[in-house]
Structures are given as structure tokens and as C-alpha cells.
Amino acid sequence: FEGMLKRVWKDVLDHDLPTPFPRMPYHEAMDRFGVDKPDTRFALELVDFTETFKTSSFKVFAATAISENGAVKALNAKGLADITQGELASLEEIAKSLGARGLAYIKIEKGEWKSPIVKFFSEAERAELQQRLGIGEGDIIFFAAAPWERGCAILGRIRLEAAQLLVKRGKLTIPADQWNFLWVVDFPLMSYDEERGGYAATHHPFTSPAPEDAALLDSDPKAVRGQHYDVVLNGMELGGGSIRIHQPELQKKVFEDVLKIPADVVESRFGYMLRAFRYGAPPHGGIAFGLDRMVALLCGTTSIRDVIAFPKTQKAQDLMAASPTPVTPKQLRDLHIQTVVPEE
């Protein structure tokens, strides 16, 4: 697969892609970049300060830091202290849309740390922030205090927005002709669904667990890594796939013991597959690849509408084919469709 991409980039752009592509575990991608499809062409990485703030006088951070799965993370948007109130309000709305109560920040202007929260920080806490974030004049530090995954996602989105603001100001360059391919691997096999009160498959229920983690299915399903992989380029997922379960006993365990699907439902929906596996299905897997996304990137556009054969408008109209068009009564009869016009 990497060989195919290498050939395409060479033939189309005369660019030599280095292979093999780097591999980044899901946890690292979220922890450093706040997203499972990181754009690694620029830094602005997230830094974890959970341990730092466990005994802090700032109760919001301290309470999160000592809570189960809580995390306090920070991001230094270097040179963005000149952010406008409108831009700051927009970032805060984005953070709130992802579950944050607000967006804490510190501006560094004229050598002074400007923020209502600074008064709660000890000298040791300030020193660690300074050292690990490389804080300098004109910087702005954004914080997220939340359950780990949510906190990462909040700052991950702020990271992308801040990068665009820095690009607009000429303070950051993101090369359009830099192709940072990587594989994101080791996704969690299961995630806990709070509403349903049980586990759900992160990818799909046929993904095979990592062999060394399979024993944890009984005791700690959320700690099991799945053999799921995504190929990512410059912050865009080009494709994803997995190695599938091929052992009937393991597949049945995932259905019934982990996902809690009733045995009769498993039999009615998947019985044919479990029986087929008993005849010796080999280990197998694959990948679903977004050809249109790849072509869009090669053409220098971010919208697949520019490269697909029959793009649709926002109203789902195909302007080239002038569709959709009215259907005839005969077509409706052939398909046994009856339309009912509401009474006015």
C-alpha cells in the first residue's frame, strides 16, 4: 500500500515519499495533538500538567487533576497574544461546543502574565509552565481541564484554529508541498457508552484485538487495543481498515460477553458467519481508501467536490445532470411507492 502511494506521488508530483511511513499510537496522537489524525507539519503540541496541578490552589485544575481519568493540558500558541476579542470569543465557543465550560488562557505581554487565574499559581507551577512550554513574550497559553479524551479534543481543535490565526498573521508557515504521511495505530477496541451503560465497538465489532491484549476482554475491555489502523496525511484521514476476527469463539465472546448482545440476536444476525468461521477462515483484513481525497490533495484543493465526477450542491442537486428530476406515476407504481400530499 505504501508502495502504491510512493509511486503515485512520484509519477504525479515527482516527489519521493520516504517509506516506511511513521507509526503513531492513538494515545500518543491524542496526547500530543488532540486528534486521531494529526497534522504534523507544525508543532504547537499539547503538554500534560496533570501531576503539576494536583495540589494547586487553583481548585478547578486541582479537582480535575485528582479525579479519575482527569487531565490538565496546556498549549502554547506562540506569538498569538495579539489575538482579538472576537477571535478569542470564537475559540471559546468552539471549546464550549466540545464540552468545556470556558477557555482559560494566559497572555504574556510586556513581560507580564495576564490572566485572572495566574494569582492562584505557585512559583513552582509557574516555573514548570515556563520551562515545559517555552513561554516567551507575545505568547498565549490555552488550558483544558477535563476527562483526558475530552481535554485532548478541546485543545486539539484550539490548536488547529490557533495555527490558522498564526498563518493569517504571517507568524507560522504550513508548507502546502510537505507530505507528512503516518499510520495511526493501537486504537482502543472498545469505548464505554455512558448513555447505554455498556461497551461499544470503537471501530466495528469485527475488529480483532491485539493478541497480547485479548486476555483483558474479560477484566478490562477498555484497555484492549484493536488491530485498527488509519493512514493520515497532513491532518486528513485518507483511509482506514483493520485486521478482522477469524476465530468463532473470540467473535462470539466479543458479541455476547463484551457488547452484551443477546445470544438469540447474535444467532439470527451473525450465525451464518460464526458457522462459516468453523471451516477455517484465515486471518484477514483490509483498508478502505479515499481515492477522491487523495486526488483532491494532489490537485491542491481541500474539497472533494472539485475532483469527483458528479459533485452535489448543498441542496443535493447535481447541476451537470440536472437532477433530481420528477418521477412519473408509472415509476412510483413499479416500485410500490405511494405519495400522500398533506392536507392544508
Spell out what each predicted region is:
Residues 1-344:
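Class II aminoacyl-tRNA synthetase catalytic cores and aaRS-like
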